[in-house]
Structures are given as C-alpha cells and as structure tokens.
C-alpha cells in the first residue's frame, strides 16, 4: 500500500483496485423489508421485497451473503452481448470494445457470490475470461508499437488492465521522452529508427518476469 | 451525511452538491497515490470526514444498545470501515511521500502536524547519516544536502519526478498545451472519459483544479 519501494511508479494493489470497483452501483432485488440506510457514502433504500433497487457492489455482496437479496446481472453480462464483444475484440488488432471500467472486478465478485443469479453462468464466465485474454494480449502487442510522444491515448481499457501495464508503459514513455528532448534537431528518420530499437529493448524485461 | 444522487453529468454545480465526502476522499486518495509529488493536503476534507466517521461510530454504539437489527448495524459498520480505510490510507500516503521530499513547495502543502513530523524526521535522518557515514568521508563531501561543497544546488535531495507519466481521465472536454518554451505549441484534447498516458507536468494544473482524475 503506502510502503512502496519505488516511489516513482505508484501501483495500486489488486485489492485496492477491487476496493475502488466496489463502489459501482449494481441492481439487486431484495427479499425483505428494510428501512433506508443513511451511510457516510450515501443513502440507499428503502428495501421492499421484489422491488429492484440500486446499491453499491460491496453492499450488494454483503446482503447477498446473508441471503437478503438476489442480483440482477448487469445488461452487459448477457451471453449474447459478451459473445458479440468477444468477436469484435478478436477482429480488431488495435481498438478495444467498450466495457465497464471495472468489468473484471464486477464479474469476479458476481461469480464468487451470485452464481445462481446469472443465467448460463459457466458460459458467461468463460466468455469473460476469453475477453480478458484477448484484451491483455492486444495490450501487450500494442505496447511494442508506440512512437515516442508526450501523450498516449487508450480508449476503453479497464481498471485492472491499466494497473497491470502501468509500470511498464510509464518506464517506456519516460525513456522515449528522455531521448526525444535533446534530439529535437536530429533528422526525423534517425530518431524514429532509434525509437524502434528502444521499443525492442524495453518490452522484453518486464513481460518476461511473468 | 451527504446524499449520493446520480451525477448525470449536467450542471457542474449539481455534481458538486451531490458528491459525498467519501467520494471526494476517494478521489484525493487516488490522485495522491498516482501522482509523483505531494498534492495539496485536503485539510478541510479530512476534518469533515473525521467528524462524520466519529458521528457514525457513536450512532452504531447507540444502535447496538437499542438492539436494532444486527444486520443493519453490521452494514453501517462496513460502510464505516470503508470510510476509515480511505482516510487512513490517505494520511499514510502523505506521511510516506515526504520521507523523500523536503522541498519548499512540499512544505507549503503539508499541514502543521506534518511539518513538525517532517522537521523532526529530517533532523533525525541528518544526524543518522552524519554519524554513520558522512564523518568518515573526506571533508568536501560532508553535507547531507549537497553532493559536495562544489555543488550549487541541494542535489542530494531527490526532486519530485515531474516528468514522469501518469494515467488520467478527464471529466469534461479539456484542451492542454503539450510543449513548453519555444517549441511549437501543440495541444492535446481530451474528451470526457478518455484515458490517457501523459506526462504529469502537462496535467498538473488540471488535476489541481479538479478537471482531471488520476487513475
């Protein structure tokens, strides 16, 4: 957490990423009556049997574990939608499909605690895992093709994925930037070929550690 | 206790009114963690959060005494735990950050207590270094702050690494100046919700004003 050895590259631990995801709102169907809850983080409720209501993920899991509600799986988690997304991810080498920012964490928590609330659970689960694999693989291959710039835009990457690639990308971009600045006068071609070589050196190390 | 209505992204005023303190604390914690230097210490926010936490702690004790449904009590306790976790992590980050920093700018941002802590810490560190190592080095190299008497600046003090890259997302459409000083000004435009890996220096102002979040 706060005790990091390398202060230059801050990392969130997976638990912290999950913590942040737990504030996402999900829909549940309570099976009991309960008054409104006035939390520090907000007001939720009231809870009426069979009336769906939106609560943060952590609260939903807590209620579910005590048998007080069932989950309504989010729209994006249907077999059809996920199959479509998987197809689209496989087709394009460079763009990522739009998925909720915390889809990994949400999916994992739902699988762990709410299996019976998800239709075709096994199918959904394997789809999500496939999507994760394809996206991670895409991220890895794309990382080798940066041109050195000051800003890189990546759309639709999720929280967990960002966290995984963050240290490497930061180091790579820093290296580009450092080498870019004093060479502003050098011929463009020489610079881009040098960047190519740079790309070849940097990716190997951190990825192989896995 | 603030209510957490759906921030539909319309008027900024509404978003401000409906963001709970916990949300703000979470944002401050996230930004602080991802940034390469200490950000402005959110004293008022921390105090408000502390107050609310204490209030809830008392309420929970009351609930337990009055025999309210233990389920409800445990849920309030969970919410409390989450808020406490955020607060503690945030304070811990502040303390850790200035183990490495001792620049003037950092001092401006720290709270009073932290300044006291920092000076004490720095003094202890200096003494420790002196006794163990520096006295054994040749005379020119004996300062904690300078690499040698020849250096003009305090170059033994690690400067915050402002040129590093961070991941960020903007809340609204934002247009930023990419290059500084004499180079051709280029701008990068960030739509709402886009993710960027970008140099910290460029987005620093925007983060302080709350337009951009670090991730």
Curated annotation (Swiss-Prot), chain A:
Any GO BP: DNA replication
The keyword Nucleus is annotated on this UniProt entry: yes
UniProt-annotated stretches for the region Disordered: 182-210
CDD domains (alphabetical): GINS_A_psf2, GINS_B_Psf2
Coiled-coil blocks: none
Entry keyword set: DNA replication, Nucleus
Pfam families, sorted: PSF2_N, Sld5
UniProt GO cellular component terms: nuclear chromosome
TM spans (from-to): none
Main location: nucleus
Cellular location(s): Nucleus
Keyword Nucleus appears in the UniProt entry: yes
Role according to the record: The GINS complex plays an essential role in the initiation of DNA replication.
Subunit-level organization: Component of the GINS complex which is a heterotetramer of GINS1, GINS2, GINS3 and GINS4.
Family per record: Belongs to the GINS2/PSF2 family.
Protein's name according to its UniProt entry: DNA replication complex GINS protein PSF2
Natural source organism: Arabidopsis thaliana
Lineage: Eukaryota, Viridiplantae, Streptophyta, Embryophyta, Tracheophyta
Recorded name of the encoding gene: GINS2
